[in-house]
Amino acid sequence: LGLGQPDFPTPEHARTAAVEAIESGATDAYTSNKGTVELREAIAEKTARDNGYDVDPEHVIATAGGSEALHIAIEAHVDAGQEVLIPDPGFVSYEALTHLAGGTPVPVDLREDLTMDPADVEAAITDDTAMFVVCSPANPTGAVQSEADMREFARIADEHDVVCLSDEVYERIVFEG
């Protein structure tokens, strides 16, 4: 287990918008390194609507994909020799991106229901820990952390002064049952 691969097509409205942008010439030049203003504003609106908190579009960076965003976050917060706690099994790039930053990946085994146990994360934290990664819904298992677990991860990050990198790439891909 290491990689989740969606098995559904790109939504029609997204395909149509991409074709229209190409045909209108809107894609003929570079954008800001942070992404277009319109996209960053849309991300801020989505965050307020769906996640319940406000984000200034000036503080939003739209990346070319999730791996680029993870790379930027890990490089920004992990110094050489520092540890990053990662779910095991988990997305294959967590380990590689930690190595690229000069860090040491520390696998944290999942529970039988394939979620991370906050107690296991807290027990694995050392003086060298810079960050721990939580992915929910998880890649590649699809397991979803409970709200109580997520609140506990926030407490752990605050109390231990470490970064909790919450990988939410699949936040809308949740199936009941």
Where does each model-flagged region fall?
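N-terminal small-domain helix-loop-helix segment of the aminotransferase-like
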Residues: 2-65, 72
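Short glycine-rich anion-binding loops that position phosphate/pyrophosphate groups of nucleotides
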Residues: 6, 67, 91, 136-139, ...
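Conserved catalytic-core motifs of eukaryotic protein kinase domains, centered on the activation segment
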Residues: 7, 12, 54-55, 96, ...
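Alpha-helical structural signal in soluble globular domains
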Residues: 17-21, 42, 46, 97, ...
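PLP-dependent aminotransferase-like
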Residues: 58, 75-130, 134
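Active-site phosphate-binding strand-loop segment of PLP-dependent enzymes
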Residues: 112-176
